[in-house]
Amino acid sequence: MSYYLSSENHLDPGPIYMRENGQLHMVNLALDGVRSSLQKPRPFRLFPKGFSVELCMNREDDTARKEKTDHFIFTYTREGNLRYSAKSLFSLVLGFISDNVDHIDSLIGFPEQIAEKLFSAAEARQKFTEPGAGLRALQKFTEAYGSLVLCSLCLRNRYLVISEKLEEIKSFRELTCLDLSCCKLGDEHELLEHLTNEALSSVTQLHLKDNCLSDAGVRKMTAPVRVMKRGLENLTLLDLSCNPEITDAGIGYLFSFRKLNCLDISGTGLKDIKTVKHKLQTHIGLVHSKVPLKEFDHSNCKTEGWADQIVLQWERVTAEAVKPRETSEPRAAAQRFYGKRSRAEAPLKCPLADTHMNSSEKLQFYKEKAPDCHGPVLKHEAISSQESKKSKKRPFEESETEQNNSSQPSKQKYVCLAVEDWDLLNSY
């Protein structure tokens, strides 16, 4: 009987009878329930009870889908049919290199035309905004192409960009124009020390208006030029206006800029202005201008080069980071109820610069052009002896005056260096 209960494929033998206590019982009726339960197998589960299946046939990875379609150009015909053509091998290789531009060893000797296309492709893929990799990629281009990447940089009132992207800004080389007006740098800022490096010796126009500079900052900026004849030796335009901590002693450090043609020291802490005017004219030939010079209207300095859009992108990112959140309706209603005015979201200006420009005289200097040495040709050959004598005396007197004037700066060639100057020079 146990064999029958355990076997499932056993043939039915028919009714089975059993006698018990003098009574005959049929065993098949009692085993019908057991047999039915044995003949029904338990359902088999292929997956566990909490398992679920999701079809992902149309949900591919974005990078994989881009790799599949990036090699083709899709266009439409006149009939409206979709037509695709393969991209050139140059564009495919250019895209691959731009995706891995931070792994390039060097670009020195690479053609400029191809490098500009590579820079644009990397910029379109936003490779220069990636932390770490963007700085390495930018340094590869600046080391090889210098002023082509950026020849002029305007960061006027962009102190947030300077604080966030200082290393990227320091990577630019061979700049000719640099505008750092209204950035509140101070004497100890790292960027002010970077101005004296050889990488920025090509700067000819430097705007440092309203940067909290003092005589110590001017001394630090001019030390390499005064002693080692390097640094900002090619400077032709300098704007130091609206720095009240610069005094008469600080102006004396500027005499080392022999190529300086335009200087603005309006709004500084000068006491003896008449003496300063005389020294500037005698030492470097700068004359005080009675009218405002157009060189200091900040319209000529603009960001120019391959990386001009990158600088604009930095400005947008920093502006969005400090943008105030939108006030909720209950808060706005409460402000209206209590009569509070919302803050105006206007760009910050230079209040110090405006006050100095309105209150004090503009001290802008320029270098006069040398007069033409070739005078008009005399028509008459007969010249009186008196006129010839006068003409001979004049160049002789002029030569004597020139010798006297040249002897004065020759005596001033030997500059006494302070201990702070030697400490600064030893740091290079």
From Swiss-Prot:
Region annotation (Disordered) ranges: 379-412
Key word Phosphoprotein present: yes
Gene3D superfamilies: Ribonuclease Inhibitor
Classification via InterPro entries: Leu-rich_rpt (IPR001611), LRR_dom_sf (IPR032675), LRRC42 (IPR039631)
Keywords for this protein: Leucine-rich repeat, Phosphoprotein, Repeat
Keyword tRNA-binding in record: no
Modified residues (Phosphoserine): 406-407
Pfam families documented for this protein: LRR_6
UniProt LRR repeat ranges: 149-170, 174-195, 202-222, 234-255, 259-280
Domain of life (superkingdom): Eukaryota
PANTHER family: LEUCINE-RICH REPEAT-CONTAINING PROTEIN 42
Family: Belongs to the LRRC42 family.
Name recorded for this polypeptide: Leucine-rich repeat-containing protein 42
Organism: Homo sapiens
